[in-house]
Amino acid sequence: MATEFTVAEPDVLVATTLFLIERGVTPYQFSVAAGKGIDTSGATERLRSAFAAIGRSPRFSGNGPDILGISDSEWWVVECKGSGTGQPQTQRNNFDRALASVVSYYEEEPQGVSTQQQGVTVCLCLALPATRAYLNELQRRVRSPLRRRLNLWVLLCEPSSRSIKPVSPDAQF
């Protein structure tokens, strides 16, 4: 995979956070990835700074979904994944782990929210760079019936601009 398609997971997480805020969803918990080549402290600082600008302080967790967010009508559970320069098999394995994680977060009702927020819609979300490898896997393995049943959104992070293209559960890739 070419280097222009390298998108670090923290970049996907920050772009997804900005998308959620624009949608009216308040992210309240983050689990920032750690590992080889990942600038965890940089991503954490970027999130802290962004939230300080709006007078909030995000909560960080060492495990679970990458982002939890709530609005008056939606509860978002987000799994983010970056792309690297690894072999195609590595990219497929990363995709498999991300898909398995987001599906494992499925709930019929929001968890850990106030009683006033219990009736909101649960939105699962897989946020990925819009690379050829990930797009192929999405088209091949994450078909519309599954996305509709789970209310699974896919957020595609454009590698060059880091902007998000949302794909709703009813839309095609």
Regions found by a protein language model. Give the residues of each.
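Catalytic cores of nucleic-acid endonucleases
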Residues: 81-141
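Active-site metal-binding core of divalent-cation-utilizing nuclease and nuclease-like domains
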Residues: 4, 29-77, 91-94
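Domain-level recognition of nuclease-like catalytic cores that cleave nucleotide substrates
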Residues: 123-173
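Short glycine/proline-enriched coil/turn segments at helix->beta-strand junctions
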Residues: 21-22, 72-74, 120-122
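Short, well-ordered coil/turn elements that cap or connect secondary structure elements
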Residues: 72, 117-119, 147-149
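Nuclease catalytic cores
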Residues: 2-25, 35-41
